[in-house]
From Swiss-Prot:
Official protein name in the record: Interferon beta
Residues with the Phosphotyrosine modification: 24
Family statement drawn from the similarity comment of this UniProt entry: Belongs to the alpha/beta interferon family.
Main localization category: secreted
Cellular compartments annotated: Secreted
Glycosylation sites: 50, 92, 99, 171
Gene3D superfamilies documented for this protein: 1.20.1250.10
Phosphoprotein among keywords: yes
Gene Ontology biological-process annotations: adaptive immune response; B cell activation involved in immune response; B cell proliferation; cell surface receptor signaling pathway via JAK-STAT; cell surface receptor signaling pathway via STAT; cellular response to dexamethasone stimulus; cellular response to dsDNA; cellular response to dsRNA
Post-translational modification: This beta interferon does not have a disulfide bond.
Length: 184
């Protein structure tokens, strides 16, 4: 009788590990496709760049070196980044002359990916509690606060938006790098 339960538990553990790895592979594929779509949409948002507006928002170094992060922490980092990029682009971009349809498409893509991550990470509540209070999370939130503050200080003018657009494009490249962490 005990052997039957042991075998049953072993099958469950094997199945759950396989299911998690499949989820990460699916997540990696969907994230990379989505991020490339977002990059394509960002390229369509034209404007003039004024080099005097450039600034260093100081993205946390931890996200620059994803090989040191666990898969679930990587997924949490991507989720925080996507949520904050979404919030940035919900700001007042009317001074840019950007096509609202393109911005809406970008927001839709970001929202879908955030929702997908939410579903996948729903089972990781204990890790979420650790992640929420981590220095990486706090660093990311401070980073995006600086981006939002920069736009506000520059009164959401088109030059500031072009700087932020370039920074978000860089964020998407970082997310692609983080996404490769799911292969390990």
């Amino acid at each position: 009788m005990a052997n039957r339960w042991t075998l049953h538990i072993a099958f469950l553990l094997c199945f759950s590990t396989t299911a998690l790895s499949i989820d990460y592979k699916q997540l990696q594929f969907r994230q990379s496709t989505s991020i490339r779509t977002c990059q394509k949409l960002l390229r369509q948002l034209n404007g003039r760049l004024n080099l005097s507006y450039r600034t260093d928002f100081k993205i946390p170094m931890e996200v620059m070196h994803p090989s040191q992060m666990e898969k679930s922490y990587t997924a949490f980092a991507i989720q925080v980044m996507l949520q904050n990029v979404f919030l940035v682009f919900r700001s007042n971009f009317s001074s840019t002359g950007w096509n609202e349809t393109i911005v809406e498409s970008l927001l839709d893509e970001l929202h879908q990916q955030t929702e997908l991550l939410e579903i996948i990470l729903k089972e990781k509540q204990e890790e979420r509690l650790t992640w929420v209070t981590s220095t990486t999370t706090l660093g990311l939130k401070s980073y995006y606060w600086r981006v939002q503050r920069y736009l506000k200080d520059k009164k959401y003018n088109s030059y500031a938006w072009m700087v932020v657009r370039a920074e978000v494009f860089r964020n998407f490249s970082i997310i692609l790098r983080l996404n490769r962490n799911f292969q390990n």
